[in-house]
């Protein structure tokens, strides 16, 4: 067994590229926070196992927090209004699971998140925009968002990454085709349009009108006493009033 374990370690180290060697054989180092260059952006594309903390602000700014020896493997770039955050770290399994990279993003006009990573996203205050959109594809972390917008779209296409939203909205569009859950009970809204084609559950409490469609194993729980715009129940899941 010891020989097998040693072989796995050796293969992992061999797989590390030259510019990732420190990632595989060195410690994270002391915690450090560094500023990164920033310019205005409207979309954030987040990959890898990186936690992001969002703050609505009048200026755009980015700081990266983590072990000094690993910060060079974290990429933050902005082009054509898109902020891209990724990591080249490959040997996280040899370190303490709590030693995670955190990126603090101050944003003035963020209105779209494209999420393909496994880190978590949180907000220190409300992100205020006319519209806001989340597109999750193979994401596996949790997005805890505080959004104030007229219209919000939460689209979870694949993967188990959940959305838990607070704030306010006039209209919400909820969609899932994966394993994820969507909980918008804390986001006050008037209309809720729900398409659950996945196996996770939705929770929504529109004050005016509810539209619900279930096509798979996931349930839709709706609360309050909204007008029912339409109901479709074609999966093994159900549309449920309350719990």
Give residue spans per PLM region.
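A generic structural signal for beta-strand entry/edge sites
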Residues: 61, 80-82
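Active-site-flanking structural segment that lines cofactor/substrate pockets
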Residues: 72
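Short carbohydrate-recognition loop motifs
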Residues: 82-88
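Sec-dependent bacterial lipoprotein signal peptides
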Residues: 1-16
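Short acidic/polar N-terminal linker immediately downstream of export determinants
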Residues: 16-69, 88-106, 122-123, 237-243
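Extended, compositionally simple hydrophobic/Ser/Thr-rich segments
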Residues: 42-54, 103-105, 110-243
